[in-house]
Amino acid sequence: MQILDHMALLSPLDWIAAGAILVSWHILGWMIEHPFAKRPSVTVLMSERRRDWMKVFVTRDPRIFDSQILASLRQGTAFFASTCLLAVGGVLALAGNTEPLRGVEAEVTAMTTPVLIFQLKLGLVALLLTNAFLKFVWANRVFGYCAVLMAAVPNDPADPTAFPRAAQAAELNIRAAINFNR
C-alpha cells in the first residue's frame, strides 16, 4: 500500500481531531507569547524579571547565587528533554506493538481498527513529543550560551561593557525561556 492508501483509512473525524490539535497548539502558543495588554502572561512578566536579574547580577559579589540559578534552569531543561525522549520511546514501542491498544478498543467499542491507524495516530503524538524534545534541548543550549555571556561580564560594575553584556545575557536567558515554554 502506498502512503495515500494508508491515509484513506483515516475518517474525517480523525482529520478534524488532528487539525484541532495542531491549530489549538499554535493558537495557545501565540496567545502565551502575545498576551492582551491588560493580562500579561507569565512569560512576559518573567522576561522583565530576567532583565532585572541581570542588572543586579552586575553588582552582586560573589556571583555564586546567579550561577546556581542558571544551573537549576539548565537542569530543568535537561530533565524535561530526557522525559520527552522516554515518552517518544514509549510511543514508538506502543506503535510497534498495538495489542494493548486493541484490548482497550475491544472494551470500549465494537469496532476493530487496523493496526496502521493506531500507528498513524501514535505518529502524531511522537512528532509532537519529538518537537518538545528538540525545544528543550535548544533551550538548554541557549541557557549554556547565557552562562558563557554571564561569565564574560566584568567584575567591575564601572566597566563600560558590564551592563551591555549583562543585557545581552538577559536577552539570551529570555530566548531560552521562550524556547522552553514552546
Tell me what each language-model feature is.
Residues 1-5, 85-111:
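Juxtamembrane "helix exit" motif at the C-terminal ends of alpha-helical transmembrane segments
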Residues 14-42, 80-89, 122-144:
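Hydrophobic alpha-helical membrane-embedded segments
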Residues 114-117, 123-167:
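Cytosol-/stroma-facing membrane-proximal "stalk/adaptor" domains immediately downstream
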Residues 66-93, 118, 122-126, 135, ...:
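Transmembrane alpha-helical segments and their cytosolic interface motifs
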Residues 53-67, 148-178:
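Solvent-exposed, non-transmembrane helices and loops of integral membrane proteins
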Residues 35-36, 40, 94, 98-99, ...:
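Membrane-interfacial segments
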Residues 8-19, 109-125:
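Hydrophobic alpha-helical transmembrane segments
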Residues 32-70:
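Membrane-interface amphipathic/juxtamembrane segments adjacent to transmembrane helices
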